[in-house]
Amino acid sequence: MTIKKEIKNLFLQKRFSEIIFLIESKFEEKTPEILNILAISRLSQQRSREIYKQSLSEFEEAYLKDKNSQDGLNALMNYLNAAADLDDYLGHQDTSNFSKFFLDQSVKFFKEAENKFGYNPKLILLGIRIFKRLNQLDTILIYYKKLFDKNDLNLLTFTSWIFFNNYKTYWNQKDYFKFTKLLDLHIPNIPNEKLINLSKKKNDKIKIGFLSSDINKSHSITFFLKTICAYYNKKE
């Protein structure tokens, strides 16, 4: 069995630590394909600030080694995804700007690849992930429009495009009506027999739900919930 076949089998079995050891011990010169596998294996095995840094370095090396090939493009798309994931991993509470360098590099590489490869919906969606984390709203809307013009929006990305237009005044009420109606084309039809009947039974319990992307101990909603639970009198 060749080393590449062995790596493939290990990857299918998700034995990532063995892949990392095998590549680091057997490959003195690593191709873009091997660098891609190595970096993916690192991130699949463990997530940390240093692991992200090392994996991003390997994705970058793979891209720079062969910018014009599919392997190079794959490495770049992995770089964009990992850079966005790193920013999410560190969270808003991180003030070191550690991820900012990788986000800025992502923009540079994205523009470069777009000029080289032309329209690529997967590349654009990953670019949008980066632009969101850099708060580049106008750029986000430009690329969502490109996807719309090519009929490459799905339900999730279509609703995201509508949502981000709320922060601008480009659309009027007719535009919102027009595009929200188009959502019907992306919503699956659910047969009646698969629908769940909602209970109409009433009781004295009050049920309250809160939805937030970042509820934590210092979040304002947490203090609100504490006061509700502490002082609520169900007899009144």
PLM regions: where:
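Alpha-helical solenoid repeat scaffolds of the TPR/TPR-like class and their adjacent stem/linker regions
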Residues: 1-236
